[in-house]
Amino acid sequence: MTKTITRVALIVVACFVLCGASLAAPRSAGVTEPPVFAFYPQAGIAWADLYFGNFVDLDPGPGVLDWSCGSQTYDGHSGEDSLVRSFREKRIGVPVFAALDGAVVQVQSGLPDEHVEKTMTQVDNHVIIASLGGHVRTVYGHLRRKPFVRVGQRVRAGQQIGWTASSGHSSWPHLHFTAKFDFQVYEPFAGACRTGQSYWREQPPLPAAPYAREFTFSPQPFGGRRDPPWDTAVRTGTFTRGTRDVYFRIELGFFGGSPMQVTFTRPDGSIAFDGVEATRLRGGRATWASWHERLDLDQLGTWRLRLAAKGRELADAPFDVDRPGKRRNRPPNPVSLSLDPADPTGADVVQCLVRTSLVTEDPDYDVVRYRYRWRVGAKLVRDVTSAALSDVLRHGVARPGRRLSCTVTPSDGKRRGPSAAVSVSVR
């Protein structure tokens, strides 16, 4: 087996040189502690298509300490870094939302948004919102060139304010989210080293085991990093019968670097290859690895590649072997939906969550985008296409007694998969 291993150093740094237009917000009395956030202000699902690369550094000295007593941060880091899976998703679009009602007090825009190298002098595109009479400020950093809001504008929780990008001091598309109470940074996550109340309505737990965030096959070698201009390898789920080079790549979260069990199975269930490969990857950060195997693809039909570590299956990836000239583009696989909260009131921010396999979103392993269409009764109130596995409808749009629905259609950019829908009566 020929093997290429790459570690993505996703220690993505947030650096805010707070410049651009600004507006002071009036202060009010009576607010004694930070509010609880109803949702994370970025489209996607935590520890699925969103990966938290860094939390707030709670160590006042030169060391590092995150809320779980781990080291998922760096010295002086002032917020949460939530990463999307690639620059391809960034270009499709991953929305960023206001976490609370408030007033926009600062906007920086118009700067390049696909940085892959970190330079301390680089300023990012960002938005700052003041809430609760100015006691709370939320910062949304590394955005695309053109945020959706302007200084002085009033916004509601769940309102889209921009798109995820990699502007400023950044090496990967992500949102840097900072929460401040009375101008002091605080950590919304609660745990062993940040005791007390969590400031998330539903705090996502840390993964208990490694998991696959993305997977693809290719008939060609992969390049190095997956940032612009990207490797030129063709994503595929179909190979031609014969002796072929099969390249495959997996992105992993919370992987500890243990040996990887690699097994190729023919359509009749027989084993074409079974081996253990060292990975040399270290845990804590998102990492990705690619290998290739020269296989005798001697049977037509659906083959499977299974990757496992420490007895845990990380990927079960099917691919087809066909006759020459039979390669085709297939639509994305079906998805299922849920709403959060499941029984919303008119005052709730509502999320539409997509459930799908992170390995087999698409049978050809294409990057999938999702069209979200929200309706209140028959009226279309939001229509957006993004690469994220969730979308958000701001509070106040759905009135009590009305029917709220979310319809999602997956697409690979050429073919649409089957639409899914979910609906509920608003209390």
Give short role names for the model-derived ranges.
Residues 325-427:
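Ser/Thr/Pro/Gly-rich low-complexity disordered regions
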Residues 272-283, 382-388:
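Solvent-exposed serine/threonine-rich low-complexity stretches and specific carbohydrate-binding patches
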Residues 307-309, 410:
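Conserved structural position at the C-terminal beta-strand
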Residues 281-294, 388-391:
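Aromatic sugar-binding surface patches on proteins
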